[in-house]
Amino acid sequence: MMTSHKPSRRAAILLMLAGAAILSLSGMDRPLCGPQELSRADDLYRQGRFDEAARLYAQIAAQDPASYGAALGMGRIQLLRNSLSEAETWLKKARELNPQEREPQALLGEVLYRRGDYAAAAPFFESLGQKAKAEKLKAFQDRTPFLIESGPDVSALPFVVTDPLPQIKVTINGQEGTFLIDTGAWELHVMPAFAEKSGLKPLATTDKGIYAGGRTASNAHSLADSVRLGDFALRNVPVVLPQSPGGPFQVDGIVGTVVLYQFLFTLDYPKGRLILRRNTPEMSKSVRAESEAAGAAVIPFWLAGDHFVYAWGTANGAGPYLFFVDTGLAGGGFICTERVLKEAKIELPKEGIQGMGGGGAVTSYPFTVDLTLGKVRRDKVRGMYGAIPPGFDERQGFRSGGIISHGFFRAFAVTFDFQAMALYLK
């Protein structure tokens, strides 16, 4: 008797299930990430949920290597992490996938700028119309910016005063002056009279800076041959030359974050000093171990643009929000956005007060607020509303809740570690 080779219905079902299992194990049954997943990743980025966004961007890029949005998203986040090599790889890929888009070009310029490769960064900024910045960066063709010519591993500079904002002595081209410390500023700002005294020659092109209240002011640019900060002697330091004295302080200039992040630095408010350390991996490990042993709060942060440090905090229990760590707010510790004003139920007086920012007069409305940054809490911190430039809350492509400043940090020694991307407060 002949045996039929036609499989039974039960056998066919078993074969079908086995095939499905094989496909499942190989991952072939998973659908490719599409527009919805990319939109979800972009939304996470806008919310400041960068680690979650990065995981989704990476998944999309793995399944669709031609995804411009995923490559750009990964490049943005690696730059926020200050992971420059990884950022460069992703941003170059994004540029290859969509050469007409400007953002990869801008962010690649930022990678090179942070790395100190100024001459290579210049064409990127020039192509974006930032002619003044490009001209300054070209001046570094045969120079190493922020070259530490001499100095110890650690140097402490006493504050001349601590309030309303810390001031230190800085020597430029052999001339000593008094400078504010302000992480809300970018490079070394030198006021007109002291610039002339120290022989700083402005380059041809000027641009405009944005200051409190959205005010703008013209800036020229220059290059300082020598700068002394405590026991550190630096050469080839980029300089911003404000075209008007500006601001309420009689100082010779401002030391901004681009100068400070050449070091692993501490603003030691209780002891009235700025501590500068060589910015090495070994120093980073040592400082973290010392800080943790001393019970310091460890607060992760992100770096946007050339000087915008962001960390998570709350206001009156609302949030969390990403706050810009800008230590240069005299007389206050917080400036909030309209969104935080409403969500934190902050009440304002009917009449504002007049103040001065880098771009001129600013009207703001004072209040007090309970704040946290990481796990650090300060109650009844003096805040202001009205001093934030329009569009500030989404200027970097993600939502910010405002600025956290001097009045919050005044009780602490605050260490900025751009290797570990963490603040240490003790």
Describe every region a protein language model picked out.
Residues 7-8, 28:
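Intrinsically disordered, low-complexity sequence elements enriched in Ser/Thr/Gly/Pro
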Residues 9-14:
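N-terminal export leaders
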